[in-house]
């Protein structure tokens, strides 16, 4: 590298400047991870060269042995991490090193809390491991040339980790990238070769490429002839030695891999600072042969419910990296799963379009789905306290994502149902499965009852539960946005029908005695004039008014007919910008309630009728159509 052009100065994207400050402070408690991150990036660069080299063998430039090298220079106080991978063009260096190249950057920055552990995890998830070099360096120089470009199209990128960086065009004979860290005075212990080798073996042993360092030999001090040497030192040679095992971890036998190695591979793969909850490593043989190493993270990524959420599966073919985010290999409701799939059958030039049509991919996807559900089922059924805690953590983080599978995966719907957990009218903890509920059903109970609402508190205090509480019948409480949608695809569990207590008529069968049924019939007949008058007064808001079969303490509640969308689902669809068919709820009134009894003969019948309706709307989590009119009616009634 000799010639260079004039220096051009650029400013960092505002979020990057903030991030650089954060990196040097929040991550300082675990500084050695900088080496893991930079070696991982170097390995990725070599993977990308392998992939592009399939169609462009000239990119190898007579240097086909891919590797990563770590060099220590005590005199200049630098560590250099270099690779002979794909390299960067000048524009790529400006774009990739000066911005966070990911949508949702502002959302990312808003989630930073100042807490070292949680912020470190966020930083890793957003793929900005390069900046971890500033944990130990007060200046970073990057020298690179992209494969396929001429030698004089190299680039040098320099930054002191503040608000700007400079870029120069240089001549670089070899392709690839060298990252030169100019160490701060408090980080000079990373110039110790033995320490660096330990860090490489700890974090990066599984990297499939050789990671090399200059070999050192012991050289005794020179002494006069006949005298015994009293000391010596290690000196570097021109020979490079491989520090790591240099074999892809997933290709090894499970018996040869320690738990710590599995965890470090996961952290390197995902840039997650937390250990995974569980993993499954298998070689699948048959018509379609592949190796799968799948992980369940301990924490959901910040974008899991956004359109930007990507599947965390890397696809390899015969150990050649093909693509990140291979979403065809895992169903969308398992998008939280991270890992590696290495296929023996797919072509090396496979495209995302081909993945959609491939029979082998369909087989791999089905196999991955079964394996993940089996892994989760094992945690759920385990009597080991640690496994139980892992499943509880999993469900807190990913339960709502898993529920999407009820509508997406008919084949595995029963398996998914068995993994779901809910609070109930008898217990607040979200720990009751459908099987648990069924085992606790009252004698004579014919259905599994549930109620859905916008929050756990709203579900627990739903007016529709009053009769069930009076009868001592347990009801499942569903309080997540996805619940109402998901339950549209489920009609029974293990032969027992599911019944939404806010839909249709309530029939408790043998749990409701003949006298109660007779009393309800008499009340309906007695209040028919009031019901007719209410029907007329609320004709624009309700499709029907009827005497309730489910209320005890509340004056009224809203219900929907079987097969119709609930108010919660209507609100959710509208918030998502989807068209919703017009529908009106059914208003059920409680003839035993004083407010309802006051309707008969009231001079303010219409006002009272509308207040009762609006209160029913509020009770199920909605808002009155005209809040101002509601307040006006309340005030008018209070003054009487």
Swiss-Prot record:
InterPro entries: HATPase_C_sf (IPR036890), HSP90_C (IPR037196), Hsp90_fam (IPR001404), Hsp90_N (IPR020575), Ribosomal_Su5_D2-typ_SF (IPR020568). SUPFAM superfamilies: ATPase domain of HSP90 chaperone/DNA topoisomerase II/histidine kinase (SSF55874), HSP90 C-terminal domain (SSF110942), Ribosomal protein S5 domain 2-like (SSF54211). Residues 353-571 are annotated as: B. GO terms for cellular component: cytoplasm. GO terms for molecular function: ATP binding; ATP hydrolysis activity; ATP-dependent protein folding chaperone; unfolded protein binding. The keyword Cytoplasm applies. Residues 1-352 are annotated as: A. CDD domains: HATPase_Hsp90-like (cd16927). Keywords: ATP-binding, Chaperone, Cytoplasm, Nucleotide-binding, Stress response. Residues 572-640 are annotated as: C. It comes from the Bacteria. Signal peptide: none annotated. It is found in: Cytoplasm. Belongs to the heat shock protein 90 family. Molecular chaperone. Has ATPase activity. Homodimer. This is Chaperone protein HtpG. The gene is htpG.
């Amino acid at each position: 590298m000799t010639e260079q052009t004039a220096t051009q100065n650029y400013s960092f994207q505002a979020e990057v400047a903030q991030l650089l400050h954060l990196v040097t402070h929040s991550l300082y408690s675990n500084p050695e991870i900088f080496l893991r991150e930079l070696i991982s990036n170097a390995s990725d660069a070599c993977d990308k060269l392998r992939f592009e080299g399939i169609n462009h063998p000239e990119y190898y430039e007579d240097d086909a042995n891919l590797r990563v090298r770590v060099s220590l220079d005590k005199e200049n106080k630098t560590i250099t991490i270099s690779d002979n991978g794909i390299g960067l063009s000048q524009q790529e260096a400006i774009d990739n090193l000066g911005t966070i190249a990911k949508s949702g950057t502002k959302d990312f920055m808003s989630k930073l809390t100042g807490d070292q552990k949680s912020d470190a995890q966020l930083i890793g998830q957003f793929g900005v491991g390069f900046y971890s070099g500033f944990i130990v360096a007060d200046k970073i120089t990057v020298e690179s040339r992209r494969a396929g470009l001429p030698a004089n199209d190299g680039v040098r990128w320099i930054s002191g980790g503040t608000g700007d960086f400079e870029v120069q065009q240089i001549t670089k004979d070899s392709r690839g990238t060298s990252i030169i860290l100019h160490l701060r005075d408090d980080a000079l212990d990373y110039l110790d070769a033995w320490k660096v080798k330990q860090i490489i073996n700890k974090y990066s042993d599984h990297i499939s490429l050789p990671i090399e360092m200059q070999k050192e030999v012991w050289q005794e001090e020179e002494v006069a002839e006949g005298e015994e040497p009293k000391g010596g030192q290690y000196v570097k040679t021109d020979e490079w030695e491989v520090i790591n095992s240099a074999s892809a971890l997933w290709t090894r036998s499970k018996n040869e891999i320690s738990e710590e190695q599995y965890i470090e591979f996961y952290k390197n793969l995902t840039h997650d600072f937390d250990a995974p909850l569980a993993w499954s490593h298998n070689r699948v043989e048959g018509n379609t042969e592949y190796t799968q190493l799948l992980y369940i993270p301990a924490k959901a990524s910040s974008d899991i419910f956004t359109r930007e959420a990507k599947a965390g599966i890397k696809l390899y073919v015969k150990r050649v990296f093909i693509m990140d985010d291979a979403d065809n290999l895992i169903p969308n409701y398992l998008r939280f799963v991270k890992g590696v799939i290495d296929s023996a059958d797919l072509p090396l030039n496979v495209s995302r379009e081909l993945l959609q049509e491939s029979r082998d991919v369909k087989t791999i996807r089905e196999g991955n789905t079964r394996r993940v559900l089996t892994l989760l089922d094992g945690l759920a059924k385990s009597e080991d306290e640690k496994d139980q805690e892992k499943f509880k953590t999993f469900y807190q983080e990913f339960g709502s994502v898993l529920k999407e599978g009820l509508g997406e995966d008919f084949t595995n719907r029963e398996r998914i149902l068995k993994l779901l957990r809910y609070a109930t009218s008898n217990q607040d903890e979200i720990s009751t499965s459908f099987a648990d509920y069924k085992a606790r059903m009252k004698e004579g109970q014919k259905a599994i009852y549930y109620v859905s609402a916008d929050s756990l508190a709203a579900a627990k205090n739903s007016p529709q539960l009053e009769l069930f509480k009076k009868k001592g019948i347990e009801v499942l409480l569903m309080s997540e946005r996805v619940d109402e949608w998901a339950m549209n695809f489920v009609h029974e569990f293990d032969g027992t029908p599911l019944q939404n207590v806010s839909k249709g008529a309530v029939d408790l069968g043998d749990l409701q005695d003949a006298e109660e049924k007779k009393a309800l019939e008499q009340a309906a007949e007695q209040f028919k004039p009031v019901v007719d008058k209410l029907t007329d007064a609320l004709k624009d808001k309700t499709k029907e008014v009827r005497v309730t079969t489910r209320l005890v303490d509340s004056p009224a509640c809203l219900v929907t007919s079987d097969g119709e969308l609930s108010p919660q689902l209507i609100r959710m669809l509208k918030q998502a910008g989807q068209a919703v068919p017009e529908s009106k709820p059914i208003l059920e009134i409680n003839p035993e309630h004083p407010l309802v009894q006051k309707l008969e003969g009231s001079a303010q019948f219409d006002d009272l009728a509308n207040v009762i309706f609006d209160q029913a709307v509020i009770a199920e989590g909605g808002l009155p159509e005209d809040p101002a009119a509601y307040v006006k009616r309340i005030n008018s009634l209070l003054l009487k």
